[in-house]
From Swiss-Prot:
EC number: 3.1.-.-
The organism of origin for this protein: Picosynechococcus sp. (strain ATCC 27264 / PCC 7002 / PR-6) (Agmenellum quadruplicatum)
Protein name in UniProt: Putative pre-16S rRNA nuclease
Origin organism lineage: Bacteria, Bacillati, Cyanobacteriota, Cyanophyceae, Oscillatoriophycideae
One annotated GO molecular function: nuclease activity
Function text: Could be a nuclease involved in processing of the 5'-end of pre-16S rRNA.
Main location: cytoplasm
InterPro entries according to UniProt: RNaseH-like_sf, YqgF, YqgF/RNaseH-like_dom, YqgF/RNaseH-like_dom_sf
Amino acid sequence: MKPVAALGLDIGRKRIGVAGCDGLGLLATALTTIQRTTLEADLAAIAHWIEQRHIQVLVVGLPYAMDGSLGKQAKQTQKFARKLAEAFGLPIEYVDERLTSVEAENQLKAEKQYDRQQKGLVDQRAAQIILQQWLETRQCASKP
């Protein structure tokens, strides 16, 4: 399996959780939370991470409804992801992100790092979970 530089994104209306992976493409790590303001500012903040980490692919969590359909938020996420692809010329890979925020909260609570006032930590951890799922799927697909 060839190493990949991927950036995981948990895109919400107010914040974007950001995660990166190690040089081998095996382990995802939470990086930061971007407070959304304008499209230009959001793109500039993401551009910083793309340049700093030499990103080759953007992995975006897609918030399917529990019945598997694409709701309003999922369509907004896809629209923003298309803007990312156009702005940076990078491929977009989608990951089903149902319940990743709940999983992120539970992990942070177990680590005694959860604070209701710091929702950005949940977004970062959700982005990490999204990216880790993608990395693991990629690893399984490359095995004979």
